[in-house]
């Protein structure tokens, strides 16, 4: 395999295909002399998230998303970039690979960074995913020959599928016959590169001659309702294996969401389908794989390919159009065995396959269909035909067999219980139904009845429900029988005075429910305390008599619940009967010695549960009533005190250690906070000031103020320390609100940048003086700014209409349309090729002479700076500029002095990563242009030098005025981000060939030779007199 440039591997799911390339990648990464960068591509975003977790887990490889490479280029650290097929087919990716050597040399100034392996997982999708084949067309443009090796992996790619898939992406396909390695090395095709040589196939399934997936128990069931049957199976699994996980594959995205909505009350679910965004799919997949409390992953078939999930014990497929590949991939998720259920609705399995797709699986033996797909010998009608299917358990592991048996026993038990429920009276079925519902929905805060001297279905002579026992003075609850004595709850004991429910203890005058405490005249429910008089359950109050909240059906003599029996001294629950010594539950009756539960009755020696009645010797549960000798349960304040305690809630920006600030302390602050939230309502999202002004999203994309941060502000403007970072106020006066993502200070400096967009240097300097009262008050400045909101919006639309036309609508700039340019500059009469040659010549001279780039383009000063050209990365480059004082000179000579001292320096960080990506992509295009013209490829500047050039040109007053005069389609821009965007648009040269505007800028700059520029004429501030025609 190591001697073959392109290989395809088919191995069964769970075989360990990841390790086939994981170990070689680690070996490549360990080489010290050369840095290898490899790429892995998978079909779906869900699988991408799983691969990132698995490959980065060991720490041997530096793994990153391939989107980082597409947007920013190679970072020199990452060993493996992981992406999806759409990334592999993108033009940006293929361009970066085509220009790899040039980009590497410009970025790292070394040839020791090389392309390693190209790995494509589940590559059968190139052929079987019919609806996506149009998206794969861009892969044919990829330069496969640039890679050290190409590896194609799949668990479901027989020779015919593999050959067609490889040809579809532009490769030769599989080798038609096996070839000796010496013959391979002598092959002329190999000298032409990887793409021209056939791919060698390693079929590990045929070599083993074993049918895959025999370790999984596969069950095909036809049911009336797929969702109901699936829910039963899942509940049974989690009852047997509470820590296990399961996957459910649905047919449609709507079904996925419906199942997730209806099942989330039973267990924690994660759902995924193709309509979710890529980031959301990655986040949800990661959550399911890493969060042990997540039980079920529901999704369409994209959740079945390549995902490796620990504790996965069941896969359920509800898709009626499942083909053999999807079945194998789904079953293959059960790495260590488990259960796979194929649930289909009765009389609905027949389905036609769409053109070009594989047909759905047939009803019958699953193993035999798997053999047919892989080209293995059929065993139909022979011994060993069924492997893990059709009831055969021979090849299953002991754990899987045990799981099947436990599932069967549970199913039998549930079936027996169902038959018993059918035979019981309707009232009992009702009770069980409500109990099941209560498991998920009920709360323990409310009680239905109160008792005197007893607790929870336990009295001196009481009645317990659902039993057959006979006692002395009570009536059966929830039955229609009339008895002389009483009945014990779910026991067969007969007692004289009372019976303990759910315990084995017998007491003299009371019963402790679920406790072991003995009391004199009261009962503690769910506590172990011993009291003299009584203690309220779930409260801390002590009362004289006693009341048990969260109990039911307790009386002095007896209680009749949900029955029609008539007794002498009993209680009718859910009836309107009036008794002498009893308690009415859910009625309006008035009694002498009883307790009203959930009623408005007034009693003498009783307890009101969930009422507002006032009693003499009682405890109110979950109420705010005031009592004489009681305590309110579940209340936030003492009923016998007048104080109103208030929560101490601090705003997130408040330093709690320094300030004991309470929100009630300043009503003025709360009011101001509320007003600001209403005035700037979208600060909870990623809002920017252009949205606040009313610009559309497509306009914001090109006017957006990237690179604008606190360093844009001059010293002393919105930069005070020791205050709230969000609003620059003292902590006790902070007006930020919880959940605010975009601070008022950030909006203020963006608003300041908008004002800079509309003013030249002198006007902006005066503006900074005008807003001096707001230098320490960004909130006040925002209010001042918002007053002119409509006027500012209109002014930007007028002043930047030309800019939006060029950058957003991509209107063409032609030098031939500029009359002044044709008359006043030789550059405007040059061809595109001449402009490019001049550009490369300028950079060649700068490289040879080691000239300081920024200083040269600022004022044609050819000062030497060898450190700048020898710097190996961006940080060293910036340090070299700072060491020779470039940034200080720039601030003293130009409008850069109107920003913070670190502003220009920080432009070399990550502010302009999108622009950097576009520039590095253009290197590949320029390289191809040079090769097409027959010109010897010239070295082009790396990104940091290129950015230095544009900053120098931006701050060069003479050059700016000359360019704006000659090129009539552009006007002035006063923000560096806008200048950088403008420099990258394309211009039609005199011969109608396209060149980047920055190349035209360098040609104009070269034309303005230093001898033509008067010495010492650079103003400190960059100011343009629009009435003066420069250059005439």
From Swiss-Prot:
Enzyme Commission numbers on file: 5.6.2.-
Domain Helicase ATP-binding: start-end pairs: 1-175
Short sequence motif DEAH box: positions: 121-124
GO molecular function, one term: nucleic acid binding
Cited InterPro entries: DEAD/DEAH_box_helicase_dom, Helicase_C-like, P-loop_NTPase, RLR_Helicase
Keyword check for Nucleotide-binding: yes
Region ranges (Disordered): 455-658
Low complexity composition bias: residue spans: 455-634
Segments forming domain Helicase C-terminal: 232-381
Pfam families named in the record: DEAD, Helicase_C
GO cellular component: cytoplasm
Keywords, alphabetical: ATP-binding, Helicase, Hydrolase, Isomerase, Nucleotide-binding
Induction statement: Induced in absence of telomerase TLC1.
Biased segments, Basic and acidic residues type: 635-658
Keyword Phosphoprotein in record: no
Enzyme class: isomerase
Alphabetical list of Gene3D superfamilies matching this protein: P-loop containing nucleotide triphosphate hydrolases
Binding-site positions, ATP: 11-18
Family indicated by similarity: Belongs to the helicase family. Yeast subtelomeric Y' repeat subfamily.
Functional description taken from the UniProt entry: Catalyzes DNA unwinding and is involved in telomerase-independent telomere maintenance.
Name of this protein: Y' element ATP-dependent helicase YPR204W
Source organism of this protein record: Saccharomyces cerevisiae (strain ATCC 204508 / S288c)
